[in-house]
Amino acid sequence: MTTESALADGVREALSVDAEAFAERAAEEAEIVKQELRDGSFDNHQSIVGFEYEFYAVGDGRWSEESRAGEYALMRVPRRMLELMGFEKELGLHNAEMSTSPQPLSDHGLRAQLAEVRARLEAAENTAGVEGMRLVSDGLWTIPPAGETAREYLTDSAEVDGVTVAVNMSDSVRYHAMANADPDGTDRDGPDDARSADARVELSAPGVSLAAETVMPESLITSIQPHYQVAHAETLPRHFRYALRIAGPLLALGVNSPFFPPELYDDDWDGERVLDEGATENRIHVFESVLNARTDADKVRFPREFHDVETAVDRIAADETLIPMPDPGGSDRFDDAFGTFRTKHGSYWRWVRPVFEGASRSSANARIEFRPIPGQPTVRDSIAFQAAFAGLMQALAQREHPVIGLDWETARDNFYAAVADGLDAELAWVGRDGQRTTDTDALYDDLLDHAEAGLRTAGCADDEAAEWIAPLRWRVANRTTPASWKRDRVRDRLDDGDDFETAVVDTQREYIRQQAETLVDGGFSAWTGGD
């Protein structure tokens, strides 16, 4: 049996799962999770941090024909190479993902996270370099594979035994199954069943619209995801409410996807209009529009808060099921007792989300996954966001910071203002004195002071805490983000007479060249002559 036929069989199996029975099983297992919460199974003796880090591969022009054909053009990563790297597959064939080992929140724990990312990434780069490619940490790629257009790469699909398969997507049954289910969750009748217009995926962002048969356009984007395991599961709702209030301000510091591949822009959007009206963080638009096109409710969204932990469990169980995946079975994990519920985590696409799982009872945890931040220019900057998020989760709740009183609607508006304008956005905040402010310096002084304070309570010395947060303070002081760095260089190139496509592509190449020198051991501030 070919790989494609096996994938088609997997898709058909997924589409044959009874959606109602799946939902009933998830609801039943939610009761198991709630009982385990009452029994203290998800409690730990301290806070723990983890990290997910996504990359895409590009050609460096040294060896392979594909990489020589286009400097820093997107490249597909051979599956065997991913195994050699010790990385995991992601949506696109060009993607690679790393997940760190959970560590206690402390200076030693953060340094262990940093060391693990650096060691594994350096080894992966050495492996990739042999094949003439390198991994890029970024928010959204803009140079398609050599000899292909971005549109072709993102929309190419084929029929295999009556199943629609995205040619450049990894062999993830769930994602391929989305292309073969009608919007009401039912499967297609067969290879001759005509697809209706509303069954298509539509990527929609300022100046960009792209129709596709599959969710492959989501593979434009890459992210970092800090995780924070609470020590006591009953405190998760309070931590979650704080996480929603800091989502906008932290995203504003991290924006890094201001441009699409130039060919994807609508005809009436030239470079000037993109700079005037385009978003600084298009990754949010991509993920929301592509995946929300397949559901009745918007599964990808800024989430509502909850005030007790059982409500969080109920919301996950009741979330609209896109593809009711079959029970894989065959393992001996603690959370196999609620395997269907755990499956629903995978498509509980909220920008901040609660997760309940554990391979064993001793490792079971209740955590918050913080998903808004795009890939960053360097490892050091990426871990700065992990440290800031963890420090804020520690300090804001411990000190009962009054920003928890900021209404949810304003927290949501802050988030989408950051998507649009990054550090130039007007964000509302409630300071430690209880006064509401929109002053950027006052907001970030308070925010980052509390991030440092949280790290100190976790055992970091004063200078250690300051060191972890320093890359973010630099961004505030200099009003510079990765997105503004890219926008400034595109602006300069347009002013020098370049056309928009050349300006974007050459800026992307400059980004990757700078990153090649600083990704593992340097910092973003050095790109502009900072310390």
Question: What are these regions, as identified by a protein language model?
Answer:
Residues 457-531:
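C-terminal amphipathic alpha-helical interaction region
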Residues 64-67, 107, 236-238, 296, ...:
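Short helix/loop capping segments that flank catalytic or ligand/cofactor-binding pockets
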Residues 101-109, 223-229, 368-377, 431-436:
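Glycine- and acidic
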Residues 142-365:
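Loop-rich catalytic cores of soluble enzymes, especially ATP-dependent carboxylate-amine ligases
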Residues 371-464:
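Substrate-recognition/cap regions that form aromatic- and gly/pro-loop-enriched pockets
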Residues 59, 102, 139, 182, ...:
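Short, flexible loop/turn elements at secondary-structure junctions
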Residues 128-137, 248-278, 395-418:
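Flexible helix-coil linker/hinge segments at domain or subdomain boundaries
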